Amino acid sequence: MFIDPGFPVQKQQIAVMGYKYESFDVYEYRGERLREALETHLSKGNIAAMIYSNPNNPAWFCLTDEELKIIGEMANKYDVIVIEDLAYFAMDFRKDLGCPFEPPYQASVARYTDNYIMQISGSKAFSYAGQRIGVTAISNKLYHRSYPGLTQRYGGGTFGTVYIHRVLY
């Protein structure tokens, strides 16, 4: 499921693979109203993961800590993986996020759930125009979790090992 607006290539990748997806525009569901939208989609039981950009590309807004907490709570309630696209990591210039290991820190759903994958772009951070360099960070709990569907399709392993050795490789 896509929390829009988002990066259109992500939907294109899903379409190329022939999968269905759901999406909604977050502008209509800011703050506590986000819970309603997530509940509507996730309660059907057919969503395995959700993705959003924060700071957002292309609209350049940021989800609040309250909204990230709601996303984390819903991910826990419905056992859904949150893919957090942090392509513009630490580029919320309303506060100084430029000192590593010192507060304030990048806002992240990782504070509220263990069902997360963070995707961080080195290309943006190091201004490598055209080059694609990135980091994927998976929570320890999710990394070591086994899913019957992945075992059936890929022949075993934890989520993390399948992600690294089958999906990315």
Where are these regions (language model features)?
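Conserved core segment of the aminotransferase class I/II
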Residues: 111-169
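Conserved PLP-anchoring active-site segment centered on the Schiff-base-forming lysine
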Residues: 1-11
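Active-site phosphate-binding strand-loop segment of PLP-dependent enzymes
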Residues: 27-97
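Aromatic/hydrophobic pocket-lining residues that form π-stacking "cages" and hydrophobic walls in ligand
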Residues: 71, 104-106
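Hydrophobic residues in well-ordered beta-strands that form the structural core
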Residues: 2, 23, 82-84
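A short helix->loop->beta-strand "cap" motif at the edges of active sites that frequently abuts
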Residues: 19, 77-80, 114
